[in-house]
Amino acid sequence: MKSAASSEDVVRVTEDLSECRNRLDAGIEENRRNRQVIQDINDQLQRFRQRANAESIESFNLTPSPDVTLSSLAHPGLTHLHNQTNISMPSLTIDIPLNSNAMISSSRTPNYAINGLRNRHKSLVGHRYRSTSPIGDYGRHRSSPRVLAHYNLDGADIGVGEENLDELFAKLKEELFKNNTLEEVNEMLREENDAALAANEHLRVDATNLSRQLQQLQQQQHTESMRFRSENTRYRNQTETQHRKLISLWKEFTAVKRQLHELRTTTANDLDRQLTEFTRCATLMRKAIRHAEQKNLDQKEQMKREKDDVLDETLRQLNSVTENYMKSEEKANERQRDLKRKEDECRKLREQNDELSDILEQLSKMAHEMAGGRGRNETPMDVARKMRKLLTTKNGEIDESREAAKQAEKERDRAKKDLEKEEKRRKDDREAERKRSSVYSQREHDLKKLDDELRKASEKIRNLEEQRESQEKLTISVQNSLNEAHRQHKQFIEELMIRHREELKEREDSHEEALRSKDTEERSRFEKERSEREKIRRESDELRETQRSLKGDVAAMKTDLDDKTLRLDMLETERDELKKKLETEREQADQRDLEIAECRAKLDEMAEKEAELRKELAEFQAIITAMEGEGKLNQEQFLESKNELNTLTDQIESLNSEVENKNEEIRNLMATLQEKEVHIQNVRTSSHQLTATYEEANGEIDILKAELTRLHEQVNERTRQISEANEKYDDAARKNDALLEDVATWQEKYEQLKMELEEMNRRGQEKEREEADLRALLDDLRGNFDKLTNELKQKGVTVDSLNEEISSLKEQLNKSEKERKEELLRMEELEQKNEAEMKEEYEVKLQLAEKDRQGVENFGKECEARMNELTKIHEMLMEEHDQLKVDHLHTEEEVERLKEKMRKELEKLNEQNDGDRAEWSNERNRLESSKNEAVTELQERVQKLEDVVKEKEDKEIALRRDLEDSHEKSRDLDDKLRKMELTDEEKEEDRKKEQKTLNEERMKLMEQKEEAMLVATKHATTIDQQTRRISVLEGDVEKLTAGIAERESSINALESNTMELISKLETTEAELEKLKDELAVMLKQNSELKNGKEGLSEKWNEERKKIQDLADQLREANKVVHNMRMKNVNLEEKKNELDQNVTDLTNKVRQLEIQLMDKAAKNEVSGDLLRKMEHDAQSMLKQAQNEQFRLTDLEKVRKALQDENQRLVNDLATVKAAFEVKRETSKSAISDILDKYRSAEEKANKGELDNQRLRSDLATVTLKLERQELKAKDSDNRLRDSQKRFEEVQSKLANLQKSAVESLQNPMSSNSRQNRSIYVDIPRAASSIGLNENSDEVPLRSSPSVRFADSSQNMQRAVDSMDVSSSVGVTLRFLKERIEQLEADNADLSDALEKAKDELRQRNEKLADRQMVIERVERQLVHITEERNTIENRMTSQRQMYLTNEESSRSREHEIRSMKARISTLELHLREKESKLAHLRKEIEVLHGQLHDALESKEKATGLVGVQDSKHRDLEEQLDRANRERELAIGKQRRTLAENENLFRKLEQLEKEREQLMREITDERRLNERNRTSLEELRVSERTWKSAMTTAKKPAEEQERAVQEQRRWEESNHEMTNRNTALTKECDRLRVEMRDQLNRMNGINLRSVDFERKNEELSSKLIVMQNTVTAMKKFEEEWKRLEAEMRAELKILRKEKLMQTAEIEDLKRKSFRSDTEKKEIEGIRVRLEREISALKRHVDALEEEKGKTEKAVRETMNERRAIDKSLASMERENQQLYRNCAQLQAQIQNLERDAGNRSVTKLAKEHSLLEARIAALIEEKRQLQSMLDQKDANYSHKRKLLESQIQLLREQLEAERRKRTKGVVATGPTVSRRGVQHTSAFRHTIERHRSLSQSSERTILQERYLEYVYTGDRTPAIQMINTPPISPLSHSGSFNSDGREARIRRESDNGHLQH
């Protein structure tokens, strides 16, 4: 109602405004008419004046001139008129200047002047708003007839004038009346405007109410969604209760089956005497047992396959999660960079504004200075011109600054939007975490389900055990019955059945022997398997321990990676760079030692070059001393060049200041990065804690496994079953691990789900395809499940202990989950704190931005333009929406076609899979034998590998000790480098220029690092996949690990080489800098002596050539670095080849021999690398011993690895055939199963991703709604501004009118009433208006004739100049146009409000639709997850059999992964080093450029030296002093050079001696090794000697000699080591001395440079005046440059504005699309509600079906009773048979007494009859067994039918959804036609399922329920039991269920009749 009232108010406002317009138009017309009237009056007045003038002239001519005193006495009223009188009328001013005599009442003139001033003051100041109306004072200065009497004494003319004046005043009164009416109209307009403002306020209140209603609707939607969720949970509970009831029915059925088994045992006991039949039964039982065993084997194989598939799928998911995590990190880093960049831009803009303000201040100062310094010759016009120029320039600058401020404001708005997006993203993150918690709850629920299923499985296992025990009892009873039958036959007919008994005995003995042999074989096999399992478990425990150690190594490697990333960041700063490089060098001390050797070689070369250069310096100095007399002119030129250099240094200092500012910014960024790294480290600590808990759980699991082994010893026959249970337990543990990993990865999955809305349709189509694939998979899995259930009936497993273990595991899981939740809460708190801090920072920034925003103008105009653009974009989006709808329809049709194709292909694939499974099951049995042999071999290999691992651990301990030594050495290097830092301080100024490039390169390096991390993760995922494929080839993997270790050594060698090259480059850079200093000195000397001789120029060219040679050397060094990099690339390529070989091992095992040859070649290459390392190690003094030990150890390892390679080659030859067969057979079946299961889980994951995307889209839509609300608020603000403007205009009008009225109504002073003359003070009035400025300069005239002439001229001039009526018209027109503009603005704003309200409504609808779609998708996801859980539960039961034979292989996989992770880390190291090399190359190039620039600048400076010769004569003495000091310094330098040369020579000698010593040491070590071998031989011989000494007592002199030789060799070795240590100390001491001398040289050079600087300062004092002039010129140039830069920046900002507008348009399009999707979601919500109602009906139907199933159960109970009756009759018959047997025995005894032959024949006949009767009983027994089996099958068939029925209903619901979606787009008749199609399709599906159900019921019910027919007359017929049909649509809501059931009953009756 309020919204309707507000719209009516808006309409009323528009109507009122139109009425106001009409009134204003009428007023304007009336004013026009008044103007015409006033013009006529003016014409008449002019005529009257002419007449009055003529008459006055005639009157003066007739009468004499009056005396002054008489005129004063006759006209006493004119005494106050000194000069002028004033008459002001509407559009009329009469100026009559009158010249009065000086004697006329001069006493009154001051009073009159005061009065005039007072009136003028009132007209100007007293009235606040001066009117521009043409109407003057009504009663003031009016020309009355009394005034006219002074002009004419006659009465006739005066009467005419009076009549004209009366008419004129009447018209003037009418004019005033009209003006008063206009004021009333304006007051009316004001009131209407107030009403409009009130209406706008009402509209604003309505808008707030609408927003509240919107919030209420959202809350209602939320409550509805919660209600739907509760209904879903209720529905799930109902289904679970139904499932439980079905399980209870199954239990009852099993109980009935047990009773039947008991009946079977009773019948078996009754038929104990029949020997032959029981033998047949025994054979049949044996066959059945064999068949069951075969089925068990097949089932185990299937379980293994499925378990492998599931494991592969989980690993694939982990890989995808890691990739998603890396992508999310990249996005977060990009966002952080964008924020930083925007902050930098804002800061730059502020700095620019500050600079502009400074420039403006400077300009103002310049203007003042120019004004102050201006001489007297300048005119004020010149000054004004200059000021105008300055003002124009300032205005231009102000405009530019305003534009820049606008751009800054836009950027600020952009930053605000980004902040809002960030806050929204964080809100989404919180929601995602909440959803994760819900997912965790669902997982807990799934775990509970798994527990229930385990309990059910345990119950089933117990039942199966009972059945098996009954079967064993049966077999025992059969054996007892056989024995008893033999005894009875011996008693009955010993004589007649001797042969028969012997044959039976032979058969029994053979059978028993076979059974015993089988039992013994099985027991032996079980014992072997038990021992093997124990070995495997031990190995697995050991491998797990190794795995833990490897995990620790992996963590250490990760920490190393983090340290190296920090090192990359440390390259940004200079001193921090060096310190952090030292930390890295401490970790890589071995590599640094290798680098020092090459550095020394380079130092020697550079020393030689230095000696040559110094010789040349000496020559140059000699030339300088010779040319000092000629160097005066050169010195003057030199001073000029120094002045220029000073200017350059000033510029450099400014640049350095800028660089320092940037460094400060970089430090701030580094601080933020460190905070983030701290946060990351906290996360890592939490992950480490989780791993620790995981390891504790594994320890407890190992304890439980030990208990299980103890239980295995007690139960010998069920070891295999317990192993399967252990596998289940391992799978549960792995699932728990996967859940823990998912906890870490799930937090970052949500960032992948922020995609565009356009992908929604495609995802929906993919979901439908996925559902079809899942259905096919479900059918296959159901078939497998049915097979498993039928086969599990024959098995039995005791799992009571497992239940206890599972309960303990649950407790552990609960504890771990609680800890995980606590950690999550901590993380949330930390994130909230960080968010609060960020918000505070951003709020401060926003406050600053808002302060800047206050100065911005013309914002309203831009908003209006934006609104117009938005309306246009809205229209475009509507058109695109229509097009998208049409495209959507086409895509749906194409999707349906694709579905049909996919279904056909799935059917074909299912058929192929069935065939492949059969073949694979046959070949699997054949491979098991070969696999067992391979397992034994692998166990032996594992033992050997464990020994190798122990050896490697010992080596690692030795390497760690070496690392500690290297750390100490690195500390020494730190001290040395600190000394080097003192020299580096001078280089900081040059490097500050390079920091810009370094920052850019750092950003590139960060990006490269992120890319490398992504590549590393991808490689890790590929490596994991490859390791899965190579799980069987453990021997090959071990071989590859050995190769990888060698590769690591080679990589370390390459890294050391790269570090050496880096150090060389650093030394070359230091040398280059030294050479730069020397070149600076030389250049100065050459600049002084350039004009002297040509020889100097030639030598200068030679020096340039030397510099070029040095540059060439640098290039060569770069080439060397490039070559090393290429070698690294080649190594990486070789590594990739290794990975390819690993993958080819699974497909091409035959090529392993060739690959092994390649690996041998690669090992030789690695051996060469090791030799190079040995050669490099010889150059080191301190670490010679450690490195030699390492080399010997590495050689041993290499030999061992070669031996292992050869052994593994031989092993591969044995394993090759088995794995080839296995690969070819298992490839197809496993790939098919993997693809299906992967596709199913991928589709489920995609569904979840789409759900989260929808949620993110909802969040974006809400953001857009908030933005539109802000826009609505902006529009309200605009309305307020327009209203304020309107009020101002109205106030102006009112003030104008008031001023006009006041000007008319202000009466004249009291003295005017006494005026009776025609003298008017016109000039004063003119001066009040602004006509006569020089009113005081009016001359005094002596005659009245002259006065009248002047008065007529002035009067005409005033009439021509003053046209006030035109100004009033202009103002009214302006007011009219302004009012029209305001009305148009008001109308536009009202339209915009209405549009905004419509958009709000539409978006609310879209939000509701989207929420419904999300709920639907969530339901689908829940359904998919339930199906997935069911599939996983089934698959877990199938996976457990597959993992028994592959536990050892999987434990090996972890080791391989760790090794490959190390490889990846090494690759990252290589890439980092490559990046460092590239960075150093760039720095060298920059240095070359700087050298070239410096040379050019110096050449230019030398050209300008000859200008100022005269100014440098006074400084010659100071130069002479400086030259003397320089000569002294040069002498000192020469001495130091000589000392350095001597030191270098000594070093060379020492190095030669060291090399000789190293050679001797190597020779001695070789001798030591030989001696050790000889000692070992001697020790062996000693043992033999000792044995011989006991017999022969020979002397042991040879032994003593060997001991003495050994001691001698040890002493010599100790002496050599001491010598080595002494030499190393001496070398260190010499190096320290050399460095000290170099420092001294550097100090001397610095002193010389300081003296030169002093000279330059002295010269600079003379050039100060010139610099001031040049500075002013530079200031002008800089000003121009700043203007150009500002303009360029303005252009850039305009471009950015265009880009932002384009982005806004894109966002608007997206918002429009989201609106359309919202509408679709609303429609889907309605459909889902309908579907919910349909599902409720379906639930009711299922309950009815449940009742029917209960009826069927009752009928089965009736059947059971009938079977019990039949069994009772059978028992009676058995009793009768016993009686007959007793009678027959009595008869036989009688007949034997009577007659032997007759009795024999009779007994034979009776025996045959008994056998026939026993056969009939056996057939009846078989029929009963078949009936029971048929009932089991019937129950499974019912279950399948129910599942198919549910599937049918789902398909029907999906079909109805599709058709309804199509029906929404289609028209009325199309809807009806589709409804018919829908009913036809539904009827077709019903008929199809009806036919299926009928066929199934015919085949099951008619074939399985058979009659019991006996051969004799006494066999009663058992009546058939008509079970009710089980149809897929037997509920009340189905179509024609009653008729179909009747039809099925008739057909079943017909089938019975046919039987």
Curated annotation (Swiss-Prot):
Q: Which family does it belong to?
A: Belongs to the rootletin family.
The signal sequence is none
- Gene deleted: what happens? Ciliary degeneration which is partly due to irregular localization of ciliary components. This likely leads to the impaired intraflagellar transport of proteins along the ciliary axoneme during the later stages of larval development.
Which keywords does UniProt give here? Cell projection, Cilium, Cilium biogenesis/degradation, Coiled coil, Cytoplasm, Cytoskeleton
Task: Specify the protein name.
Answer: Rootletin
According to the UniProt entry, which residue ranges have a biased composition of type Basic and acidic residues?
326-341, 396-451, 907-931, 961-982, 989-998
- InterPro entries recorded for this chain? Rootletin-like_CC
Region described as Disordered: 321-341, 391-451, 504-551, 907-935, 961-998
Q: Does the keyword Cytoplasm apply?
A: yes
**Which gene is transcribed and translated to give this protein?**
che-10
Origin organism is Caenorhabditis elegans
Q: Might you name a Gene Ontology BP term for this protein?
A: cilium assembly
Q: Which GO terms describe its cellular component?
A: centrosome; ciliary basal body; ciliary transition zone; cytoplasm
Q: Which Gene3D superfamilies match?
A: 1.10.287.1490
Principal subcellular localization:
cytoplasm
Q: Which PANTHER family match?
A: STRUCTURAL MAINTENANCE OF CHROMOSOMES PROTEIN 2
TM stretches of this protein:
none
Q: Which residues form a coiled coil?
A: 29-58, 162-223, 284-1303, 1368-1579, 1607-1863
Q: Can the keyword Cytoplasm be found in this entry's annotation?
A: yes
Please name the taxonomic classification of the source.
Answer: Eukaryota, Metazoa, Ecdysozoa, Nematoda, Chromadorea
Quote the subcellular location field of this record. Cytoplasm, Cytoskeleton, Cilium basal body; Cytoplasm, Cytoskeleton, Cilium axoneme
Protein function = Major structural component of the ciliary rootlet, a cytoskeletal-like structure in ciliated cells which originates from the basal body at the proximal end of a cilium and extends proximally toward the cell nucleus. Required for cilia integrity and function in sensory neurons. Maintains cilia integrity, partly by modulating the assembly and transport of intraflagellar proteins along the ciliary axoneme. Required for normal mating behavior and normal responses to environmental and chemical stimuli.
Q: In which tissues is it expressed?
A: Expressed in head ciliated neurons.
